[in-house]
């Protein structure tokens, strides 16, 4: 059976790709979103095959997330700000971003690192945290927020993994 949809292996869009989408949303929000609504489609195994999620926090900051295990869509993060927007292609393994000035249309491209080395960067950060004990760069509170959001969504969908207790 395909691991992507295997409920015994925590399969589905939320834990496979949604964690990345919700993580970047949380990193750009000044506080955790509290108003969360969604629609989802179950796969034949009961895992989440597709979902759309709307999030809003107390400061009025909002985000939209679209997840799909089947449709071909770009892995793109688009961050809309007051005076510009930021586009990150191939997120979370991006090596560049484009900032577009909303008034002038001027595009500024920023490049850093290598897509091929992206997982290595994550490992370096984790190794550094373990060796030094300094976890400040890991943003653990954001990770906890993302886990809480994902669990809240799965509860709303009544999508529980085998052996899981709420």
Regions found by a protein language model. Name each.
Residues 18-22, 119-123, 143-146:
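A structural signal for well-ordered alpha-helical scaffolds and beta->alpha junctions
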Residues 58, 125-166:
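C-terminal helix-rich "cap/oligomerization" subdomain common to oxidoreductases
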């Amino acid at each position: 059976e395909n691991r992507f949809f295997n409920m015994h292996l925590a399969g589905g869009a939320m834990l496979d790709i949604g964690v990345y989408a919700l993580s970047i949303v949380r990193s750009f929000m000044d506080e955790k979103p509290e108003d969360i609504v969604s629609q989802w489609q179950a796969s034949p195994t009961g895992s989440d095959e597709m979902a759309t999620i709307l999030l809003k926090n107390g400061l009025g900051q909002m985000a939209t997330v679209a997840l799909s295990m089947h449709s071909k869509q770009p892995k793109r993060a688009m961050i809309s700000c007051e005076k510009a927007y930021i586009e990150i292609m191939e997120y979370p393994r991006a090596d560049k971003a484009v900032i577009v000035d909303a008034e002038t249309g001027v595009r500024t491209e920023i490049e850093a690192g290598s897509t091929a080395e992206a997982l290595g960067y994550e490992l370096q950060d984790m190794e550094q945290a373990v060796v030094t004990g300094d976890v400040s760069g890991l943003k653990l509170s954001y990770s906890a927020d993302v886990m809480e959001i994902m669990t809240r969504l799965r509860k709303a969908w009544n999508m529980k993994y085998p052996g899981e207790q709420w």
